[in-house]
Swiss-Prot record:
SMART domains on file: S_TKc (SM00220)
Keyword terms, alphabetized: ATP-binding, Cell cycle, Cell division, Cytoplasm, Isopeptide bond, Kinase, Mitosis, Nucleotide-binding, Nucleus, Phosphoprotein, Serine/threonine-protein kinase, Transferase, Ubl conjugation
Modified residues (Phosphoserine): 376
Active site per database record: 177
Start and end residues of each Protein kinase domain: 37-317
Cellular compartments per GO CC: Cajal body; chromatin; cytoplasm; Golgi stack; nucleus
Highest taxon, organism lineage: Eukaryota
EC number: 2.7.11.1
Protein name (Swiss-Prot/TrEMBL): Serine/threonine-protein kinase VRK1
Activity regulation annotation text: Active in presence of Mn(2+), Mg(2+) and Zn(2+), but is not functional with Ca(2+) or Cu(2+). Has a higher affinity for Mn(2+) than for Mg(2+). RAN inhibits its autophosphorylation and its ability to phosphorylate histone H3.
Subunit structure, interactors included: Interacts with HDAC1, KAT2B, SETDB1, KDM3A and KDM4A. Associates with the nucleosome through interactions with nucleosome DNA, histone H2A and histone H2B; the interaction with H2A and H2B is mediated by the nucleosome acidic patch, a cluster of negatively charged residues of H2A and H2B forming a cleft within the nucleosome core.
């Protein structure tokens, strides 16, 4: 699902970035707090950086079961810098643990930031950041599962994503690019999901002062076009209501298998106009996406609630969770923390069974796809084009 590229007609793309050279397994790097980390095998390379397995330095080599990864890029590049600012401000382990404790959560799907710094090699400087290791992304599982998730799975995922969004919003940031490929399963617990890729994260409320609503034609359609908010289509900086709107579109796609505007994603104005039209008539959106019986009324109610939010208004997150919890109750289920990612049904709507081979591929990807965190050249280059523009507006 490509993002809208920053380089529109008449505008130049980002300057070409230097690539990070490969580091040998066993190389030691020291973060800003003087903690030493040992690199393991490389598990991915993007257009500007590399990702390695990593663990705290010891006499042992870093095995394939390493708990962390390190992202490395030349220090004069920018994509990792923008993401690093979010992690330093909002993702320290003690911050996350305090939130989990005070909000009585079982976990919070925000990657923990373990350290960062600069590392010199062969006369060149490299920036690095250490975060948790993860498993497969939801997009791979969604596609392997006939492009359907069960109603229970969609509601369970969305409840956990609401927990994540409430946390990052309370820490002055919005994500701006929620989608299945940015949602990774825990490396060891397939019932835990984490929101990653904060390259579009925007500090919407620095020092408690919310940014003003302002349309900027140069920033129209930021994000991933099929999911991005109407505000983003209009060139407005991301806000809390935008994140919640994006989640609504994700829920509809995960459950129905499609969004009404997916037939013309090359025309972002068409996508924007379709979203505006359906926002005015949520019932027609539900009829379009769910022509069968057993429509998910909770998703319609969620969308109706979100569309009433003002740009600077603080959402009532628990109200939104309660709406989704009612949806679980309506199908005879409850919030048991189980994602059930292999079940595919929606009332009377049932997808074709997933072939055993495809199921096996999805299961194997859980163990081996840490590279989903920006590792393919194509994904990284697309992200870079958007981030080159976004980087200028992220608060330093």
């Amino acid at each position: 699902m490509p993002r809208v590229k920053a380089a529109q007609a008449g505008r130049q793309g980002p300057a070409k970035r230097r690539l990070a050279e490969h580091f040998a397994a066993g190389e030691i790097i020291t973060d800003m707090n003087k903690k030493e980390w040992k690199l393991g095998s490389p598990i991915g390379q993007g257009g500007f950086g590399c990702i390695y397995l990593a663990d705290m330095n010891s006499s042992k080599s870093v095995g394939n079961d390493a708990p962390c990864v390190v992202k490395v890029e030349p220090s004069d590049n920018g994509p990792l810098f923008t993401e690093l600012k979010f992690y330093q401000r909002a993702a320290k382990p003690e911050q996350i643990q305090k939130w989990i404790r005070t909000h009585k959560l079982k976990y919070l799907g925000v990657p923990k930031y373990w350290g960062s710094g600069l590392h010199d090699k062969n006369g060149k400087s490299y920036r690095f950041m250490i975060i948790d290791r993860f498993g497969s992304d939801l997009q791979k599982i969604y596609e392997a599962n006939a492009k359907r998730f069960s109603r229970k799975t969609v509601l369970q995922l969305s409840l956990r994503i609401l927990d994540i969004l409430e946390y990052i919003h309370e820490h002055e940031y919005v994500h701006g690019d929620i989608k299945a490929s940015n949602l990774l399963l825990s490396y060891k617990n397939p019932d835990q999901v984490y929101l990653v890729d904060y390259g579009l994260a925007y500090r919407y409320c620095p020092e408690g002062t919310h940014k003003e609503y302002k349309e900027d034609p140069k920033r129209c359609h930021d994000g991933t076009v099929e999911f991005t908010s109407i505000d983003a289509h209009n060139g407005v900086a991301p806000s809390r209501r935008g994140d919640l709107e994006i989640l609504g579109y994700c829920m509809i796609q995960w459950l129905s298998g499609h969004l009404p505007w997916e037939d013309n994603l090359k025309d972002p104005n068409y996508v924007r106009d379709s979203k505006i039209r359906y926002r005015e008539n949520i019932a027609s959106l539900m009829d379009k996406c769910f022509p069968e019986k057993n429509k998910p009324d909770e998703i319609a109610k969620y969308m109706e609630t979100v569309k009433l939010l003002d740009y600077v208004e603080k959402p009532l997150y628990q109200k939104l969770r309660d709406i989704l919890l009612q949806g679980l109750k309506a199908i005879g289920s409850k919030d048991d923390g189980k994602l059930d990612l292999t079940v595919v049904e929606n009332g009377s709507l049932k997808a074709k069974p997933v072939a055993k081979k495809r199921k096996k591929e999805a299961e194997e990807s859980v163990e081996s796809s840490v590279e989903d965190m920006e590792c393919s050249d194509k994904q990284t280059e697309e992200a870079t084009q958007t981030r080159s523009k976004t980087r200028k507006r992220v608060q330093k």
